[in-house]
Amino acid sequence: MFRNQYDNDVTVWSPQGRIHQIEYAMEAVKQGSATVGLKSKTHAVLVALKRAQSELAAHQKKILHVDNHIGISIAGLTADARLLCNFMRQECLDSRFVFDRPLPVSRLVSLIGSKTQIPTQRYGRRPYGVGLLIAGYDDMGPHIFQTCPSANYFDCRAMSIGARSQSARTYLERHMSEFMECNLDELVKHGLRALRETLPAEQDLTTKNVSIGIVGKDLEFTIYDDDDVSPFLDGLEERPQRKAQPSQAAEEPAEKADEPMEH
């Protein structure tokens, strides 16, 4: 990770045409707990894995309410996410006050992109170390957007960010053709299955470590936590076990139990 003089500030380019401070901020997103977003023709769903700093601490909130038609899930620095969430709430309030209408989701994402681009260009600033999945519903239908510390943003049919998110993205790519025709219950189950792929073999989803956000046609953005998640988890089949060779069947569980969870 030694970059010599090329990672001292966000305004310094390396000879390879890279800005290392932005790449470091992208790594912060990969250290956050995983979150998944996906949509059908009528709904957009966010599913996030909550993490507790210690056994004495409560689980951190991973899904935040922005407006009646928009919510976000986060991966990365929570403090940066809180600041961006407050900015988004203010923009939504301004739209309702000035224009008497909800702010279109794509317009809000564009404003976030403009705000997060500023610290990637100015001396003495650092990029926001958080990635967002934005779920919303407007006149154009349901939306899932991804934003990055580099100020890029993408309109997605499904996406996952955070630690071990590649496993979730593999699941989403494999089942992406099914999402558009799913009803709400099936869509949430797909999100939970994708999120479960990010966990080690010895762990599973529970009401304590999962949060769900749903928005759709005639449905305001709603967050489900703790016991409210139970109906969705109850309908989820058990996690399939990895196949092992007969001679190693007794040894492998002990070996896998020692594998640390990626942070």
From Swiss-Prot:
It comes from the Eukaryota. The keyword tRNA processing does not apply. There is a cross-link at K115, K208 (Glycyl lysine isopeptide (Lys-Gly) (interchain with G-Cter in ubiquitin)). InterPro entries: Ntn_hydrolases_N, Proteasome_alpha, Proteasome_alpha-type, Proteasome_alpha1, Proteasome_asu_N, Proteasome_sua/b. Keywords: Acetylation, Cytoplasm, Glycoprotein, Immunity, Isopeptide bond, Nucleus, Phosphoprotein, Proteasome, Ubl conjugation. Residues 253-263 have a biased composition (Basic and acidic residues). Residues 232-263 are annotated as: Disordered. C-terminal extension is partially cleaved off by limited proteolysis leading to a conversion of the proteasome from its latent into its active form. Detected in liver (at protein level). SMART domains: Proteasome_A_N (SM00948). The modification Phosphoserine is found at S110, S177. SUPFAM superfamilies: N-terminal nucleophile aminohydrolases (Ntn hydrolases). It is found in: Cytoplasm; Nucleus. Induction: Up-regulated in liver tumor tissues. Up-regulated by the antioxidant dithiolethione (D3T) in liver, lung and colon (at the protein level). One of its GO terms (cellular component) is proteasome core complex, alpha-subunit complex. The keyword Metal-binding does not apply. Gene3D superfamilies: Glutamine Phosphoribosylpyrophosphate, subunit 1, domain 1. One of its GO terms (molecular function) is lipopolysaccharide binding. Glycans are attached at S110. GO terms for biological process: immune system process; negative regulation of inflammatory response to antigenic stimulus; ubiquitin-dependent protein catabolic process. Belongs to the peptidase T1A family. The 26S proteasome consists of a 20S proteasome core and two 19S regulatory subunits. The 20S proteasome core is a barrel-shaped complex made of 28 subunits that are arranged in four stacked rings. The two outer rings are each formed by seven alpha subunits, and the two inner rings are formed by seven beta subunits. The proteolytic activity is exerted by three beta-subunits PSMB5, PSMB6 and PSMB7. Interacts with NOTCH3. Interacts with ZFAND1. This is Proteasome subunit alpha type-1. It comes from Mus musculus (Mouse).
